[in-house]
């Protein structure tokens, strides 16, 4: 399997040109265009000097200086946090001491909240992300977040409109950059912290030499601080100071012919297409008894089941209300899919969910979209995780997904080989802003960010 295609729901995502060149040198955009042309011509650009690409692994990151992140309250690359340390890096600021006025943008640009309840603005954000958001390293695939997905991810209970933070051009009012934050209580080891999740940092390709991303990060930090929240969680496909955990994507083919056609994956040596299709063929029916789509009336039971299960992990969400959980997990067609199994007494014993995040295929004549399902939260109570996840493969296949993706967090890694998942080439780093604690193994992570 290739193309780990990691989420950069994060400050300094892989294609945002944060710590790149500026001044009179060619812009990051110019250099990136050249890099893309060289890549297309088959040239290995990974060892070329002076090309400002974001580091994709820890070793590469240790040798890099981070102009922006070295100024932020995050552990630095060479820092090892002892096991008994689990606390904020900077003390909370008194609210009357938090900067009251927005940070300055370059001339010709202004701040503008994006109102996702307004169809026109929602579509503007959709178009910005569709054309400028995360691509894989070979520029073959780009995430295609639907408008419904954006509302689901950003309009969570307790969301604040000013945390949907856009930048517009004065000249034509065009939306050119965005960063989003949503409230989320997170438990880190034994401490429960009110945080925000940061997501959808995106800067228009034409603006990437203007160092807008650091200003976006500073501004969303200010807007969050004003409300008395001083910590954040986010993920990124690149390495910046300093991940609390490094997870890896795994992929399970559901439609191998299409995935091979678009070069998401390739035929293994000595394998024919017919044998590959046979290898990945799934049963028609699920194995878990009484497995059905989750309903809103199931929320109280799923709330108890999931809340208990998440206690085993060192980094996990804390649902403060059934309303929060209902928003995240009650099925929404084309966005989130959730299923429960109940016993003879009507007690829910098992639960599994996945969300839909398609990718646009760049420049393919036949296929325009890969339909990808991502494993979300689950609790295997009466059956093994292996059986429950295999059932979710069957359910995703029934919904016509092409591939089923999962990270090696929770207990996932133990079941990947049996269920024919292949290791992806993309890591997903987990980050905490203004918090330091000991590093975590992927199996300690119970927080899944879209």
UniProtKB/Swiss-Prot annotation:
**Residues annotated as binding tetradecanoyl-CoA:** 67-69, 200-203, 209, 211-213
EC id: 2.3.1.97
Q: Cellular component terms, GO, for this chain's entry?
A: cytosol
Q: Give the catalysed reaction(s), semicolon-separated.
A: N-terminal glycyl-[protein] + tetradecanoyl-CoA = N-tetradecanoylglycyl-[protein] + CoA + H(+)
Q: Which Gene3D superfamilies match?
A: 3.40.630.170
Q: Where does the record say this protein resides?
A: Cytoplasm
**Molecular-function GO terms, alphabetical:** glycylpeptide N-tetradecanoyltransferase activity
| Pfam families per UniProt | NMT, NMT_C
Q: Name one GO biological process term.
A: protein localization to membrane
The main enzyme category here is transferase
Q: Which domain of life is it from?
A: Eukaryota
Its keywords, alphabetically, are: Acyltransferase, Cytoplasm, Transferase
Annotated stretches, region: Disordered: 1-28
Give the primary localization class.
cytoplasm
UniProt function note: Adds a myristoyl group to the N-terminal glycine residue of certain cellular proteins.
Q: Which family does it belong to?
A: Belongs to the NMT family.
Q: Name it.
A: Probable glycylpeptide N-tetradecanoyltransferase
Tell me which species this is from.
Answer: Caenorhabditis elegans
């Amino acid at each position: 399997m290739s193309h780990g295609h990691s989420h950069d729901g994060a400050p300094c995502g892989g294609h945002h040109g944060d710590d790149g060149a500026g001044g009179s040198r060619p812009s990051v955009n110019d250099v990136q265009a050249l890099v893309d042309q060289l890549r297309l011509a088959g040239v290995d650009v990974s060892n070329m000097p002076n090309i400002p690409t974001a580091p994709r692994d820890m070793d590469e990151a240790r040798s890099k200086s981070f102009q922006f992140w070295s100024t932020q309250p995050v552990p630095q690359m060479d820092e090892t946090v002892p096991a008994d340390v689990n606390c904020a890096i900077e003390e909370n600021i008194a609210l009357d001491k938090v900067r009251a006025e927005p940070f300055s943008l370059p001339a010709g640009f202004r701040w503008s909240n994006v109102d996702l309840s307004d169809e026109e603005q929602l579509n503007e954000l959709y178009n910005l992300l569709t054309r400028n958001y995360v691509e894989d390293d070979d520029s073959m695939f780009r995430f295609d977040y639907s408008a419904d997905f954006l509302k689901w991810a950003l309009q969570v209970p307790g969301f604040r409109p000013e945390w949907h933070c856009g930048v517009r051009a004065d000249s034509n009012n065009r939306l050119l950059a965005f960063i989003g934050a949503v409230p989320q209580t997170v438990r880190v080891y034994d401490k429960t912290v009110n945080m925000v999740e940061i997501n959808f940092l995106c800067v228009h390709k034409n603006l990437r030499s203007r160092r807008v991303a650091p200003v976006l990060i500073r501004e969303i930090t200010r807007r969050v601080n004003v409300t008395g929240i001083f910590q954040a969680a986010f993920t990124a496909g690149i390495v910046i100071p300093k991940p609390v955990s490094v997870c890896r994507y795994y992929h399970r083919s559901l439609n191998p012919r299409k995935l091979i056609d678009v070069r998401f994956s390739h035929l293994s040596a000595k394998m024919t297409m017919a044998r590959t299709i046979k290898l990945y063929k799934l049963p028609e029916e699920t194995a878990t008894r009484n497995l059905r789509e989750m309903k809103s009336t199931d929320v109280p039971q799923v709330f108890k089941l999931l809340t208990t299960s998440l206690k085993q992990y060192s980094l996990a969400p804390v649902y403060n209300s059934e309303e929060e959980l209902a928003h995240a997990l009650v099925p929404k067609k084309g966005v989130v899919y959730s299923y429960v199994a109940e016993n003879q007494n009507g007690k829910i014993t098992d639960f599994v969910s996945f969300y839909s995040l398609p990718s646009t295929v760049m420049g393919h004549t036949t296929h325009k979209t890969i339909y990808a399902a991502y494993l979300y939260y689950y609790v295997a109570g009466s059956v093994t995780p292996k059986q429950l996840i295999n059932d979710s493969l069957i359910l995703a296949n029934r919904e016509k997904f092409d591939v089923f993706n999962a990270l090696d967090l929770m207990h996932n890694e133990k079941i990947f080989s049996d269920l024919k998942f292949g290791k992806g080439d993309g890591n997903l780093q987990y980050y905490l802003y203004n918090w330091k604690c000991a590093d975590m193994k992927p199996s300690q992570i119970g927080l899944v960010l879209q």
